C-alpha cells in the first residue's frame, strides 16, 4: 500500500492531522459513507478517483433568469421541451440548438445527442463491483460503527440539501437502519451530481387501483419499479428509478408518513448521468411518531368490514362456502405489511430475545470509548461481515419463515394437553349451581374463568394469576433502537428530532402495529372456543361459567353504562356509529339454533340454584324493549336466549336502513346494547362469512365471546376463519393475514404449514376433549355405555332394481362422455342430479321426481330436476305395469269372483286366520290373498317368500301347496274413505322398498323383545320421512307404536311439543321419532332413546357421527345400538368407501370451491367404477 493511501486513511480517522490540500483522494468504494464499511477488497483492486471541491456558489446556480429571458423573447415548442429536459442549459446554447435542429423531424433527439457529445468531457466508466448488492447497516448488526468513530479532518462541501423538516402531524422520527440502493437514470443530467446531494422518493402520481398491482392472493402482478421515482430535490425533477426489489418495499410505504426515508447520493462516478446509467444512493430509514400512535381500531375495523361486506369482487362459488377474497383496502393493507417485513429483513433488525442481556450490552456501549475502525483492515471488516451473515438467519421476518417455532413453543407450553390434565378443578358454588359437574368439566370451568381473567373465581394452583402477567404477546417482537448512522448524522452532525430516551420499541410486523410500551399478554381477547366432542356436556359447561360469573365484576356496582365501550359494528348503517350503546354488564346473550331453544331453556332451569338469577327467551316478540329490560331494571336477566334467525332478522332490518336516526336511538333489540358475554352454540353455523347469518352474528357486541361447536371444520379449513373473526383474535381476524398463513399455503397443497399455523392460532383459545381421552389418573373422562354400529346390507326389490339399472345406465353414459371429452366439471350439476336419483331409488321409488330442500347436492332452483320429471313418470308407469298387472283382465276378474264366493260380505272377514302365525282375526289392512284363496299376514307371507327365495325353493302355498306368485296377490281396500265396504284389488309390491321392509321387520323384532323402547330414525330426505310415517302408521296400530316426525317444517312450539312428548317413557308401546338429519343432527339431547336407524348415508361422515351422538352422550344409561341400512352393489356402498377415505385424510382438505369440485369429481369417478 502506498504512503499516500496510508496517509489518507489516517487523515480520515484523526482530527489532529491537518492539511491544506484542496482535494481528497478516496477509494471508489466511497468509504465516506459507512455503508461501504464491509468492503474488504485487496489494495491492488482499488481504483483511486479524484474528486475536486466544488467552486463556491456553483451549487446554487439558478436557471430561472435564463428561462424568463427566453420567455420574454418568445419561444417555440422545441425550446420548451429542451429546457424541460435540461433546465440548466445556457441561453446562447439553447438558441444555437434551436436554429440547428428545431425544424427537423427528430430535432429534439438530435439536439440532445449533440449537446451530450460536445459538452461533457467526462468519460463513462463502470460503477464499482457488485453495485446491486444491498449492503446494510444498523446497530443490531454492527454496533461498533457509531458516528463518533468517524473524524473527518475538515468540513466538505456537499451537494444541495434542504433543511430537514418533519412531515405534517409527525412529532419525531428515529433511525432504524440504512440501505445502499442502486438507481438507474431515466433522464440525463448536464453535470455530475454532487456527493451528498439530497434526493427524494415519490410514488407515481397516477392513481392505480390495488387490483391492478396485486392479484386476488396478494401477489404482485405489475412491476413496481415504474411506480417509484427518484427526484432531485433541488429542481424537483425526476432523475431515475430504483430496482424492483427495493420498489416493492418502498411503493406501499410511501403512501403514508409512518415510515420516513432520507435519500442521499453517495456515488455517480463523478460524471454526468445519461439515460440508463447507474448511481448509488444511501437510503436512511426512520420510524415516525405516527406509527406509534394509538389507532382507532374500532373505526378502522368498521371501515374494513364495510368495504368487505359490500365488495362486489367477492363471488359465491357454491353452497359449501366461498373462497376468501380480499378487498382493495385489504390488499393495500397486506402489501404494506409485507413491505414492512421485507424492510426489516433488509435492515437485518434482530428481535431481542433476552432483554437483560441487551440492557447490559447497552450500558457497556454507553460507558466505553468510541472505537476507531480501520475500513482498510481486511481482518476487521471480514469479521464484521461474518458476524452479519451468521446473524442473518435470525432476522428473517417474512411469512415463509415467520419465526413460528417461537410462537408454537409458547402456545404449547401454555396450553399443552398435559397442562390441561393438570388444571385444578373449580367447583361452582351450590348457592348458584345445582348440578354436579364431572372432573373434566370442573377443569374446563377453571380454563374458561382464566380465559376471562377471572382468576379470583377460578381454582388456583399458584400459577394462574401470574400466567402472562408480564409476558410479551407472542405475536409481537422487541427491538432495540439502533444508533443513528444516517448520512446526515454522520456527515453533517445533524440531530434528528429526539424522542424520549427509550431503548426498545415493539412491533407486530405481521399486522403492521408498533408500540413504545410492552404489549403484554393480558391485552388478548377474553373468551374462546369450547370444542368438546358431541355428548360431553358443552351446554352444562357454559352454564357453569355463566352462573359462576354472572356479571362483569369490573363494572357492576360502579356504573351502569360503559361509556368507553361504544364501538358499533361497521356492518350496521353509518347512522349507528356515533351512538353510544349502554352496557348490559349483568347479562349473557346465548344464540342457538331454533331446534335447541327449548332445550337450552330447560337446561338453565335445571342448573340454576339462585332465586336472584333468571333467564329470558327472546323470541317471537315476547319482549317489548330489550334495552330497557337489560339496562334500566334492577334485576335484568342473567341469560337472554335467542336464535340465529332472530339475530339475522334484526340485523337485516337495521342494515338495510329501514330505521331512522330516532328509531335507532330508541331501538330495543339485540343491537341496542353491548353485552357482557356472548355465547353462540353450534358455532359452525357462521362458518361462511358472506352469509347474512354470519354477518349478523359478527355485528353483536360483547366483552367476552365464546363459541361452542363439536365440529369447528365442516368442509374447508377456512371454516375456522369466521370463528377467529367473531372472537376478534388479532391479527388473525384480518383476512389478509389469514390468507397469507392459512389459505394460501393450503391452496398450494402445503397442508402441514397451514395446519401448524392453525394449531398455533387456536391452541391458546380452544379447549377440546373427546370421549376417548383419559384424565391424569388414566381413567376415561366420561364413562359412557357401549355403542354398536351395525351395517345391514340389503338387496334391491325387483321394482327398485329395474329403476336403478335404468338410471345407472343414463348416469354412466353422462359420466363417461364427460371424461372422454374432458369436460366432466362442466357436467357437474347434471351428474349430481343423476347421483341424487340413484340415491333416491335406494331409499324408495316414491322419492323419484321429488326435490328435497334438505339435499346438499341441489339448489332449490335446479332446473335439471324438473326436466327429468316427465321421463321418470313414464318409467314409473312401466314399472307399475310390469309388477302390478301380472294378471290379465280376465284372470283378475275370475280370481275376484272366486274370492267373493268364499267371502261374500264384510262379516266373513272377521274370522280370517293367518295360516303361518295363526293370528285371529287378522288386521284386514295387512291381509293378502293367494290365487288359491288362502289368506296370510303381509309380513308373514313375505318372510316366507324371502326364505324360499334364499333357499332357491319354489313358492308354494303354505296351506294347499299350490304354486303361488308374489306378483299375483290381492289385498283388501276400502271402496272410499267414508265407506266400510271392502273390495279386492291387486297388491302392488312396487310400493315397498327393501329398506322399509327391513325397517318394519327390525322394529317388530324390537317390539317383541322389548316393548316400550324409544327409537330414532334418521334420514336426510324430508320426503322420505313422509313415506316412512305413512308406512309405519299403516303397519303399527296406535296401541303398539306412536309415531313422531321432527323436521324443518315444524314451528318452535311444535318442535318443543314433539321432543317433550317423545322423552316421556311409555312401557306399553314403542315410540318412534322420525328425524331429519339436517334439522336434528346436532344439538338435540336424545338420551331417552337407545336405538337408532340410519336410512341413508351422508356425504360427510362427521354429520352422521353428530347424529349418533345425540343418543350416545352424557346422560345415556343404556347401550346404544345403531343400524345403518345400505343397499348392496349400489352407489351407497361406494359412498361408504368415500366416507372412510374422508375419515382417513380429514374433511378439511377442500381448499376452495373449485378444489372441492375437483375432489367431488374424483369421488364421482369412484362411484361409477
Curated annotation (Swiss-Prot):
Motif DEGH box per UniProt: ranges: 681-684
Region called Disordered, residue ranges: 302-327
Protein keywords: Acetylation, ATP-binding, Cytoplasm, DNA damage, DNA repair, DNA-binding, Helicase, Hydrolase, Metal-binding, Nucleotide-binding, Nucleus, Phosphoprotein, Zinc, Zinc-finger
InterPro entries cross-referenced by the UniProt entry: Helicase_ATP-bd (IPR014001), Helicase_C-like (IPR001650), HIRAN (IPR014905), P-loop_NTPase (IPR027417), SNF2-like_sf (IPR038718), SNF2/RAD54-like_C (IPR049730), SNF2_N (IPR000330), SNF2_RAD54_helicase_TF (IPR050628)
Domain Helicase C-terminal: residue ranges: 995-1165
Start-end of RING-type zinc fingers: 914-961
EC number(s) recorded for this UniProt protein: 3.6.4.-
GO CC entries: chromatin; chromosome, telomeric region; cytoplasm; nucleus
Residues the record lists as N-acetylserine modifications: 2
Chief place where the protein resides: cytoplasm
Top-level taxon: Eukaryota
Annotated positions of the Phosphoserine modification: 20, 23, 129-130
Cell location: Cytoplasm; Nucleus
UniProt biased composition (Basic and acidic residues): 302-317
Helicase ATP-binding domain location: 519-730
Any single GO BP term: protein polyubiquitination
A GO MF label: Y-form DNA binding
The keyword Coiled coil is annotated on this UniProt entry: no
Annotated residues for binding of ATP: 532-539
pH dependence: Optimum pH is 7.0. for ATPase activity.
Family designation: Belongs to the SNF2/RAD54 helicase family.
Quaternary structure and partners: Homodimer. Interacts with POL30, RAD18, UBC9 and UBC13.
Function: Probable helicase, member of the UBC2/RAD6 epistasis group. Functions with the DNA repair protein RAD18 in error-free postreplication DNA repair. Involved in the maintenance of wild-type rates of instability of simple repetitive sequences such as poly(GT) repeats. Seems to be involved in maintaining a balance which acts in favor of error-prone non-homologous joining during DNA double-strand breaks repairs. Recruits the UBC13-MMS2 dimer to chromatin for DNA repair.
Name of the protein: DNA repair protein RAD5
Organism: Saccharomyces cerevisiae (strain ATCC 204508 / S288c)
